[in-house]
Every structure is written in structure tokens, then in C-alpha cells.
Amino acid sequence: TGNTAQVAIIDVEKDSVIAVAEDDRVAAVGSLDDSQNQSFIVADGYIYCYSNASWGYAPGQVDGFLRIKVGETEFDKDYQWLVTKDVAIDGVTKKDNFKYLSPTTDANGTKVYSFLNVMVDLQQVWTDMDSYHNNTCKPVEIDLAKKTMKALPIDYTSSWASYGKYIDDDGTVIFAVSTEKDGNAYFRYDPKKEKAEKIATIEPIPMWMVPLK
């Protein structure tokens, strides 16, 4: 929850810290809940680190992505992607409206998948007693290298159901959602066809998705 990104580079064989990379362009990086090992995204020879600026609870903190080249010990000074400041998606979110990503999938090339919480654009706030059930999270495809993000053809889900996503062996992406239109369900998105289909309906709100293989 600090104002500075800090990443320790560790020699696991020697059990020693080699260096600590620090950068004040974004706030603390990593996820509070790292049960799916998503604090770091390794893609195209870089380690990408994301800050959600304490979910908006800390005014003045900056959210976004930084990266470290694999094998190096400092953040790449030529790369930053400030999500709130830089990202606009027609019909979804405007630049400078606070927004944050849930933990992403592993990378497929330089692309990852996540849910983008745009509660500010939808005029929802954390102080709403029912905020966890408000449908404010939009499934998105992210290209980390190109710094692009696009909304996918799946409805907004609640923040409770904004963690379950998985890239299958065939390259399609499975999302677990809780939407107003489709209820609690699983969708499969095909990046080649740019289409999504509902593949299952379930009773409880789906959260984590953990592949067993």
C-alpha cells in the first residue's frame, strides 16, 4: 500500500537478496491476494508489475504497469503504462477516471486477460453497502508491450466475480462471471474470432479458477 513500487530480486539457490528495484512512478506493486501467483507477469523477456493504487483508497497514489528486463535489477526507465491516466475505451471508461484491474492471466505472447473495474465511470462507489454486487467489472484483453486494452463481448460482472479467468490450451479464454443478464456463469472467449459464448450456468457466485493438471 506504499507510494513506491518495490521489487526484491532474490537468488533462490543462495537464499539471498541481490537487489531491490524501486520506482516512484507508480505505487506499491503486486496483489494483496497472491493465491494464483499473479504478482508478476513474465512476457517477451520482461517481468511486468502492476499497481492498483490501493484500489483507490489512497488519494494521490498512481496506478499502472512498470517492467524489469529479465536478468536485470532495475525498472525499465523507458516503460510505464498508467492505466487510469492513459486508458480510454469507447463506451466503457474515460481517461483520468480511476479504474483498476483484477489479477491477470498468465501471458500468451504479450497479451493477458483480466477484469477492469470502472465503478467511477458507472457512478458507483465503495461506500455503497451493496458495492460488491454492483456489476462494474468489464472483461478485457491487454497487450502489455503495445499498451493497449480492449473490452470483450461479455457483460459487466460484480467485483466478487472478477478473479476467475484462464487461458486454455487452445488459446481460448474462460471467464467466470456474475452478470445481470446471464447470472452466474462461465464464458469462453475466442481471440481469433473475437467472439464469446456462454458455456455453463452455475448457482453460487464464481470466484477463483484453479486448473488441475
Model segments located where?
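Short, conserved, GDST-rich strand-edge loop motifs in beta-rich repeat architectures
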Residues: T1-N3, C49-G64, S114-N134
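Beta-propeller blade signature
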Residues: G2-S16, Q61-E74, M129-A145, Y186-K193
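Loop-centered beta-sheet repeat module
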Residues: N3-L66
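Structural signature of eukaryotic scaffold interfaces centered on beta-propeller domains
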Residues: L32-I47, K95-G109, V118, S158, ...
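Conserved beta-propeller blade signature
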Residues: Y46-C49, V112-Y113, T172-F175
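C-terminal structural cap/anchor segments
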Residues: V92-T157
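C-terminal structured domain segments
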Residues: T127-M129, P139, K147-K198
